[in-house]
Each structure stands twice: as structure tokens, then as C-alpha cells.
């Protein structure tokens, strides 16, 4: 947790303890800042080597927020994580990767790289000493080349930017993924068919769901995320009106088996939004993300800011990850291997950990209630 004053740590810990929330695993560090859009200014992390060591890619950030642009360097100094500078402007809210060479971003990245402001340098103490080097502006082909070599080696997909998304051009306002096989995408109501962004969103959907995943199959559509309404539950009159607030359910944070979920009405004692239309949308989200516990937060104070929960948080990956990659099984599956008594559905997975895998098991359910397991060999 970045704080700008050392005394803030005690205040935050006390507030968490009063709320009955665990905080013993939290680490605080003091550093200067300009804002709180940590998704965008924070590092994009990766694993490397046989021991799954953690590294950080430090992309250029908004030069109007130089202290925030320093965040990856500060993390490097505080925690010793290797930090690699990249002379490409790219914000984390416009980054969706699958961990196996697939990357999605928007054409806003092209616009952000037309200037000549490069990497910064300073004395490491006084933010007033911050200065920027100059660089050449990058063409769209230059941008795609860099991204394709760093994170999108298998496939780099760059989709058109929406016109009325709050001004960021970020894909995390309407696109999400929980695995390497599929996407979730927000869907505008049919009443908005005349909007320019409606057509762009439909086109982006066609682009994404015609791409091939790691297993050579088209990405699966996990379902349409609902579209937020006004406070009274009515729709937006124009896309310009919507763009002034740019509410979104997609901009949530997935943390283990919990989802920190934006909503747009007061949260009741049951943890759900109190407005009927808002509650109905969250209930739809719960069905789209089975197995997750939702923690709803009324984010109306962020209306017009261009972001929500996902935008103000940034994770550093686990230092001992278990990586599981497998082809998902969707819909009705016909048994393919006949047997006198049983019929089987073949399943395989790539499972890795630096300490090795002792006994992998597949857990499955036929009715969504009773779970069974079988050893993978």
C-alpha cells in the first residue's frame, strides 16, 4: 500500500481492525504521489526462469503525473524486484494478457505514443529533480512490434477505442477474463443501437471472438456483462450523457475467490445493492462468475472519473505460483471413448510449480452441487 505520510499506516490499520478486517499481510511503503490510478501507473509483472522469479516492466506513464510514474522504480528500491524500463507509453487499464502469449489492448495506445517524451530520471530523493529524456514518436506498427515481443508473442490484438468511455480508451471498462480460454464483455442495451460506441463494441466483439486461444479454438463468450443505468434505473438519453459518468460493472477486482464489485446504489446489510435494477444486475454477475464471493461497493463517487475499483488497485503476483493451463469443456459434450460400463471425456492440463507437482487432481461436478475428484496421470 503506497502512503505519502508515514503516519497514515497506523490510521489505516486501526480502521481495518475496527472493521474486523485482516491486515497482517499488508505491506506499506512511503512514496510521493500525484493520484491513485495504480492500475495504470503501476508495473506490469511477469515470471521468468525455472524458479518463477518476479520481474516488472516499467512502461512510460502520463508525464503530468511524474511521481506516479516513479512507482515501479520505488517498488524496485523498496522490495528488490527487478524493474525493466520500456520506452513505450502503456497503461495497465489497457492491458489484458492470458499469461501464455496472448494480449489485448486498444488503439488508445497508438495515440499515447505520438509524443517525444521518454523515460524519466531523478536523484531518487527529491521529486523536484525529475526530468525526462526525449525519444522518437512511435508509429502503430512500432507499438505493435514492441508489445508483440514483450507480452503478446503468440497473438497481439489491438481493438478500436470507444468514443465515450470516460476518456481513457481502456479495455478494462468493458472487457474481462478469468482464464485463457474466454472473455466477458459488457453489452449495451438494444435501445442504444444508434450510438457510435454500440457499433464499435459490436465490432470489437466480432474481432475478439474470432481470434484463437492457446489451444487453437475460438475464444468462448462467457456471457454479456450488464450495462449500468442512472440512479433511478432509467437508461441514458445519449452516449455523451453516459460518457460523462462512464459507469461499468466490468471494472472490478478479482482477488483469489472474491470479487470486489462496483455497484451504483447504497449497499444493504446483506451486502447487495439496494436499488432493484442494480441488485438484478449484480445477481446476473454472480451467475456469470460462479464460485466467487461478491463484495459490493457503491462507486457512484467515481462517476465521471474514468475508472472504478480495477483502476485504483494493482497486484504484485504470488512468489510461489501454481500455474494451471487447460482446455475448457463447454456446453454439452458427447462421450468419445466407448467402454463396456463407462464412457469418458478426455481431459488434460499443464500444471507447473517450481517445487514440482505431487498429485494433481481434477475436481468435477455433474449437477453443480456434489463434487467428485479423479487423479490426473
What are the functions of these language-model segments?
Residues 318-377:
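Glycan-association/targeting regions that enable binding to alpha-glucans and other polysaccharides
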